[in-house]
């Protein structure tokens, strides 16, 4: 643990639509703390509704940071988020207050606690080169390249794992070191593991599935179509993370009149449920036993489970 790691932070993890944001606001009010986005999709601008960013009413109830601050034309790494959080925690007006980290991106939580190796930044030129080759040649061809240049990591990757193959080649070219070597470098913690309150929301699966369906229908009614229309007007690379947000492909198909409204909503709901299942599985398998599991945000406050860190 770093000596500068923030003590008494609150960490709230859980699948999408599980009630994390409402719990974070309630905790911010109880502690006088501030909320920090810990979700890799909610960093992008334009998609307020489809990424379920806090509403204007939510923003009025508590201070929120690192939401929608990244243009959808950009990529944004865990390392960049780590840097932004570090800068945020150093602000004079926030020091001494309780940071409440809330979101569904497991790697962000791991990075906060020092459990993620600090990966090097890769230049846009190198990234574009290898991603262009991946698109042109395919995963098997680039896996063969990796077998020659870095046989150790190539042996650990499936020949079809295009994302990790490209990442390994990018890092090797940028730094001259294998990704395996970078992964051995211990991460630096921004949050003190021992004093942090670590919470995982794990709601009933049927309840969550219904909530996801209701929420996406509300997104549609409140302007998700306009969001996607604005995103498409930017004429972005389909490979960018923002273009892969759940609902973008389905709403785009609706706008192109290749999919009905009902089918677009149904497919988006199914994709969101599948994503929530993957998130829940990750949290169950990857977070330590010191993370306390609750079925709902309300349960956190029942029976004196929540302690004010101030």
Curated annotation (Swiss-Prot):
It comes from the Bacteria. Residues 39-42, 163-167 are annotated as: Interaction with substrate tRNA. GO terms for biological process: tRNA modification. ATP binds at residues 14-21. Signal peptide: none annotated. Its cofactor is Mg(2+). Substrate binds at residues 16-21. InterPro entries: Dimethylallyltransferase, IPT, P-loop_NTPase. Its EC number is 2.5.1.75. Keywords: ATP-binding, Magnesium, Nucleotide-binding, Transferase, tRNA processing. One of its GO terms (molecular function) is tRNA dimethylallyltransferase activity. The record marks 105, 127 as: Interaction with substrate tRNA. It catalyses: adenosine(37) in tRNA + dimethylallyl diphosphate = N(6)-dimethylallyladenosine(37) in tRNA + diphosphate. Gene3D superfamilies: 1.10.20.140, P-loop containing nucleotide triphosphate hydrolases (3.40.50.300). Belongs to the IPP transferase family. Catalyzes the transfer of a dimethylallyl group onto the adenine at position 37 in tRNAs that read codons beginning with uridine, leading to the formation of N6-(dimethylallyl)adenosine (i(6)A). Monomer. This is tRNA dimethylallyltransferase. It comes from Brucella suis biovar 1 (strain 1330). The lineage of its organism: Bacteria, Pseudomonadati, Pseudomonadota, Alphaproteobacteria, Hyphomicrobiales.
